[in-house]
Amino acid sequence: MSKVLVLKSSILGGYSQSALLVDHLIGKWEDQGATITVRDLAGKDVLPMVDGEIASGLRGGDDLTARQQEMLDLSNALVEELKANDTIVITAPMYNFNIPTQLKNWIDFVARAGVTFTYTENGPKGLVEGKRAVLITTRGGAHKDGPTDHIVPFLKTFLGFIGITDVEVVYGEALNMGPEANQKGISEAKQSLDALTV
């Protein structure tokens, strides 16, 4: 039975189009018998922004403050959750040409030298191997494969850095460019999601 971790990151709650799409995928994969864990990074599972104190604490040590220890424990739990799943589904709506802050916070908690990646004589090596990722990215305009799409290259770089190179991308494009464009973008995204197997 496949285990799936879903990361929601939209700040729009019930109005979120990325949530609409990922919920479509969740329903489909649950019907196929997948065990799905949902982490709502902009809702009930919001994470703190990593500051200097937290960043220092994530390196570990024997003299951590209570806050640093709490954040290290949280990071360890997030990494364990990541490694325990076979597929990671990431929703990434475009906000001002970038990913939501809430998703970046998760990345900062799991990107740890010696834990999810390491440095070798031949360069960095990812330690989260044998996983698959699905990126669901929604945007109001049309940015796919263009110079304004920084989201997909960034997320592919991050995932590859920690060892996840099997990455599929589903685009919801031009969703704020009128009702017809929205309907077309959602329909095409759902078709792409329907083609994915768990």
UniProtKB/Swiss-Prot annotation:
GO molecular function, one term: FMN binding
InterPro entries in alphabetical order: Flavodoxin_fold, Flavoprotein-like_sf, FMN-dep_NADH:Q_OxRdtase_AzoR1, NADH:quinone_OxRdtase_FMN_depd
Catalysed reactions listed for this entry: 2 a quinone + NADH + H(+) = 2 a 1,4-benzosemiquinone + NAD(+); N,N-dimethyl-1,4-phenylenediamine + anthranilate + 2 NAD(+) = 2-(4-dimethylaminophenyl)diazenylbenzoate + 2 NADH + 2 H(+)
EC number in record: 1.6.5.-, 1.7.1.17
Entry binding sites for FMN: 10, 16-18, 94-97, 138-141
SUPFAM superfamilies the record matches: Flavoproteins
Cofactor: FMN
Pfam families: Flavodoxin_2
Cofactor comment text: Binds 1 FMN per subunit.
Record note on quaternary structure: Homodimer.
Name the record gives this protein: FMN-dependent NADH:quinone oxidoreductase
Gene from which the chain derives: azoR
